[in-house]
Amino acid sequence: VGSEMCIRDSHSGDSACILPSKHIPVRHVQTIKEYTKKIAREMNVRGLMNMQYAIADDKVYVLEANPRASRTVPLVSKVCNINMVKLATDIVTRELTGRPSPVKDLKDRKIPHIGVKQAVFPFNMFPEVDPILGPEMRSTGEVLGLANSYGAAIFKAEEATQTKLPTSGRVLISVSDRDKNCLLYTSDAA
């Protein structure tokens, strides 16, 4: 719990993700944990489950609940230093193996570093393709930046995408009125 995305009208797979969240209030994290437990029990999930939430007007909304793993599992496992696939396998196979469930041993713990998942897009290789994002996923992969600060983790993730970023020049930032609150940084040319 605690990754953070700000997306509108774009596929979640095309978004960046920061773990642990820098801005989600503790009360919302607690609500997300409660909802996830209730939904997992109701769906009788054994193993991994993919949940997507949104927070709007100080309220937590469930967007999706999928009783399956997502392609983000390896990245979250790496950031949290937890082998989630092994845990899920142990949970699913415990009746066959006779081993006790590892669930009771799971505890909340501090995430040892900051992780940023960034989508990789093919636009450098296909300049004729329109780079505008929409509801259909356009990314072709993901990378992970790990560091002890948010800025360094973001930098490492961007660097890993191998997208050529200019070091000088001007930037046009165009944001609709309804998305302006999602703009994290403003630019001021010096």
Where in this protein do the model-derived segments appear?
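ATP-dependent carboxylate activation and anion-phosphoryl transfer catalytic cores
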Residues: 3-4, 8-183
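A short, hydrophobic C-terminal helix/tail in secreted or cell-surface proteins
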Residues: 188-190
